[in-house]
Amino acid sequence: MPPKGRQGAAKKVRRKEKKNVAHGHAHIKSTFNNTIVSITDPTGNVISWASAGHVGFKGSRKSTPFAAQMAAESAARRAQEHGMRKVDVFVKGPGSGRETAIRSLQATGLEVGSIQDVTPTPHNGCRPPKRRRV
């Protein structure tokens, strides 16, 4: 039987260092079921992120514009702690939270430089799934 007490070395916990980034990118992925907002530095390293589910919405409420607004506010506040002031917005997907997420980024104090739609569209690539009959 092993002796009581510590078996191994204690795990070292490293605190996240505070990045000081003034300009970055905000990637908003808005699907029919959820909205994910990632704020990165210009090279693509994620500084902060939030989603409608991460903020506390469940089920069909994740797909609402209000949930997208709350997710964008949460991500923007965390990015501002790292010194973020200006973002270029890249929007992807057909969801309902696209415009409200951009508006809430502006409302939290981030300056929006440009807005680009980067939704992937196939040039008749893969065959889509069969139609739903409800």
Swiss-Prot record:
> What PROSITE patterns does the entry give?
RIBOSOMAL_S11 (PS00054)
SUPFAM superfamilies (alphabetical): Translational machinery components
Cite a GO CC annotation. cytosolic small ribosomal subunit
Which portions of the sequence form the region Disordered?
1-22, 114-134
InterPro entries given in the database record: Ribosomal_uS11, Ribosomal_uS11_bac-type, Ribosomal_uS11_CS, Ribosomal_uS11_sf
Which biological processes are named by the entry's GO terms?
Answer: translation
Single GO MF descriptor: rRNA binding
Asked if the keyword rRNA-binding belongs to this entry, the reply reads yes
Q: Where is the composition biased (Basic residues)?
A: 9-22
Alphabetically ordered keywords of this record: Ribonucleoprotein, Ribosomal protein, RNA-binding, rRNA-binding
A Pfam cross-reference name: Ribosomal_S11
Q: Quote the function comment for this protein.
A: Located on the platform of the 30S subunit, it bridges several disparate RNA helices of the 16S rRNA. Forms part of the Shine-Dalgarno cleft in the 70S ribosome.
Name the family the entry cites. Belongs to the universal ribosomal protein uS11 family.
Q: How does it assemble?
A: Part of the 30S ribosomal subunit. Interacts with proteins S7 and S18. Binds to IF-3.
Q: NCBIfam families per the record?
A: PRK05309.1, uS11_bact
What's this protein's name?
Answer: Small ribosomal subunit protein uS11
Name the source organism: Streptomyces coelicolor (strain ATCC BAA-471 / A3(2) / M145)
